[in-house]
Amino acid sequence: METNRIAAQISDIRSKINGYLLQELQKNGVTGLAPSHGALLNHLFHNNVVTMKDLAKAVRRDKSTVTALVGKLIALGYVEKLPSSDDQRSYLVRLTQKGEELRPVFMDISNRLLSRIWQGIDSTEQQEVVCILKKIGDNL
């Protein structure tokens, strides 16, 4: 196995995952979203209302990127932005009803993706993969 191709392999896997996610979203009638919106929506599925700052930290993106992504989600009707009662310079983000309706779709797609990723890989190997990828991430 060529160890010097690790970055290319990781990039290829990411591309395949993104393609799978877009295809599955389209099959479920969800259009206009990019895979980068998934991390934001997933965080909001697990946290009712968050500040833009906390959302940026949670998805490990800078605030300007998150602002653009949230703007698209607002335009699509999936989230809304509210002024913070604690800090007038800060905004809160929460799912709309339309955004909440995405939750089961995202969970189903996520479960099917994980099943596909781990197909033919036993639990010991899965743990090894996760451990090694974490080490690679920490090295960078």
Language model feature labels by segment:
Residues 12, 16, 45-46, 58, ...:
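Alpha-helical structural segments
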Residues 14, 103, 137-140:
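A structural signal for well-ordered alpha-helices, especially hydrophobic packing surfaces
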Residues 1-31, 95:
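N-terminal leader segment of winged-helix/HTH proteins
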Residues 23, 71-131:
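Charged, amphipathic alpha-helical coiled-coil/dimerization segments
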Residues 9, 37-43, 58, 65, ...:
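Residue-level recognition of specific faces of alpha-helices
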Residues 1, 124-140:
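C-terminal regulatory/oligomerization modules of transcriptional regulators
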